[in-house]
């Protein structure tokens, strides 16, 4: 029992990122400068109010393009001013005020349709609305603070825009190479194990970052400051990341195919090669950011020479054993792909060097620019309309926020608890669109608030000087903002300390009551959030994950159909259509990974369902990469006739994918896989007859024969077919375990999949 509880609450000790010292320093300056100005003018309270208003507005600054940040911060500023003005009318009529509160909180939650920026703008406006309702006064102190603070927040966020206009774009592209470099080093450290968790996380992160960088680059074309030539270079570098990743997939698959004893030296050399590639990619990331770091491929060249020597040794040791021939072809393929990879790296390095002087950039990459221009951004009103239905988790989130806000406001009104608006403030920061995220945020907030109240109950007895308390508060909020993405509990500890220090500076309520009120309001707000997230319009995480899995299998069926004509030797691959389906499959894989994270984080998920869900996610992504490897290899095929059993194999794969999808849709045990093992055996026997002929040809020093051409075309294909069969077996077993005790009654409908 205790072990299960520890597993459920393990997220409380887990960090989520790195400490953002830049944000902490910005927060400190944003609070300290107005406070010092207020002291100089004899009105430190106004200075503190301006600093607080600026930090409230800056909550909406989630990074990204300067233009997006400008729009987000300006929208939060205007929205906060309107919300604060509306908040002042709430006490005039309590019934009307309750209705207005519900409407404001619904709008706050529904703004999440615009992503993280929209969600934070909603939180800022709701916060301002609650402050307006709580601090109704005849003077204009709050509005003056908000007006000056909004302008100050814009200066803090984007003052560097004219000096480094393309820095967000550079950072986005540099992150691609940094993630790729870390992935390569992780693979080398894990001896190319496909099950290494760190490597798997980096693959998902790279896929997400590539998608985000493309979207960001598209958005940057809308008449923003900066040189368009530089954006063209950055687009080319994104394309190069894709090409490098494609080569690396092939290398990784080949290394995993042939785990032969006679290739131990080759494996050691490949580990060194992956480490060297990782260093080059990390240097490329620094180079994109404008730092003087020239990647060096000399070590890679030496490792390729060592592999070429191993190829000669394998050829000299060739006997009648098929494993010896497999060793030779493995080393040959590794050398060829490494050489292609080095050529691609050299082109990438040359492109990165042009970032120092974008005027030298020619129009040779107009095709890449065309890809960018074909992408269209949706109208701003489209997310509002497309999510306005009860199947949308974001609409349900808005309704939960509205109901929770009205319940919290009612409790605060009836109990007259001091600072009762903290109930609703807790709700807007804790309640998330899905239960698992709400539970994690709630637990972290309770822990941080409890520790903050405990420590401050002692500290406020020891420190009474208002000026010293002000500086301690500024330091506390700066630490809280810096730690917000690192660990939420620790950040809440400092934010709680800051809030209690503010109340101690202006003790309209005794400090002891403020401490108790903070804790009680947090508990009430958390209880409301937990109750709503668990029971009101809640979508099962099991259902969400199953829908994402069905979508992934549907895309894999379409993806496999793209390579069938080339696999059967009938026609070449339609690259444009294959790329389109591949992009849809990548999006489906990302959605499935997100659904998996939520499923694993949901405390109501049975532990026996977690392992098969994790296995399904990993192996469906691996199956997709296998299809991609086949397409990449078949694109360069010389047109040899395939093994006759390949046609039966393709039919069996199609049938397997269809059966697995049907099983998930109807939450039933999957039908048995077709007898692919027999088909694979027939393919191998046919293939080995060519290998035997080729061994004889090599001994007779015959090159460039039809036999060699066939083997060049189908060595990797046959091995990949074996891997596809094994992965389908694993997926079949995982789905059988996942559907063993179904919790869904009526099957899955894709049209209800969350957007």
UniProtKB/Swiss-Prot annotation:
Q: Which Pfam families match?
A: FUSC-like (PF12805), FUSC_2 (PF13515)
Its keywords, alphabetically, are: Cell membrane, Membrane, Transmembrane, Transmembrane helix
Query: Where located?
Result: Cell membrane
| Presence of keyword Acetylation | no
TM annotation in the entry: 46-66, 70-90, 93-113, 118-138, 143-163, 411-431, 446-466, 482-502, 514-534
Chief place of localization: membrane
- Give any Gene Ontology cellular component: plasma membrane
Question: Could you name the domain of life of the organism this protein comes from?
Answer: Bacteria
This protein's membrane topology, according to the annotation, is: Multi-pass membrane protein
Which family, according to UniProt?
Belongs to the YccS/YhfK family.
What is the name of this protein?
Uncharacterized protein slr1298
Native species of this protein?
A: Synechocystis sp. (strain ATCC 27184 / PCC 6803 / Kazusa)
